[in-house]
A protein has these predicted regions:
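Active-site neighborhoods of metal-dependent hydrolases
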Residues: 1-60
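Acidic, glycine-enriched loop/beta-strand segments at the rims
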Residues: 5-16, 64-65, 75-109
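C-terminal cap of metal-dependent C-N hydrolases
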Residues: 18-25, 30, 96-142, 146-147
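Alpha-helix capping and helix-loop boundary segments enriched in small/acidic/polar residues
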Residues: 36-40, 83, 118
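Feature captures the catalytic cores and cofactor-binding loops of soluble hydro-lyases/lyases
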Residues: 47-60, 67-69, 99-111, 126
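Short, surface-exposed, low-complexity cationic segments
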Residues: 145-155
Length: 155
């Protein structure tokens, strides 16, 4: 579980907003699975869109900026110039989101690793579909059998 309270100074997330909107900041969070039994950071992107772009009353981020922070800025930084935007000739990696319904689910402990290994899992609501390279990989929370993605190695 990710403890956002560590940044909840003085009863406010304002300091996090300052970090998020700094021109040199990139939004990202992952331990690459190293702590799957003790940390679940899967809701970070859902929280950014639901809290900072929809629910926040002061200093709300425009939804376009939140999406850009999660997509184009990171893609450009990594040199992935065929991602992060919708345009002719680019990869069609897309999420269709119902922003009104978007919310992180409850954290669950599941035993689905080899040798009955445990991990924390957190699903989300409000993602209507996900496409990778133009192929549907999830619809209404159900993962399809399609696997059009491939490993990206940065030089």
């Amino acid at each position: 579980m990710l403890f956002r309270s560590f940044n909840y100074n003085g009863g406010s997330l304002d300091v996090v907003g300052e970090m998020l909107t700094h021109p040199l900041a990139l939004f990202g969070l992952s331990d690459a699975g190293a702590h799957v039994g003790t940390i679940c950071d899967a809701s970070a992107t859902t929280f950014l869109l639901s809290h900072w772009c929809r629910d926040r009353t002061a200093d709300r981020l425009p939804i376009e900026r939140g999406v850009e922070m999660l997509t184009r800025r990171n893609a450009r930084h990594l040199g992935l110039h065929d991602r992060g935007m919708i345009d002719v000739g680019l990869r069609a990696d897309l999420n269709l989101i119902d922003l009104a319904q978007l919310s992180p689910g409850r954290v669950e402990l599941v035993n689905d690793f080899p040798a009955n290994g445990k991990r924390l899992l957190q699903k989300a609501r409000g993602y209507l579909g996900t496409w990778v390279a133009g192929v549907a990989v999830a619809r209404d929370g159900v993962v399809t059998a399609a696997r059009p993605g491939k490993l990206v190695r940065l030089q």
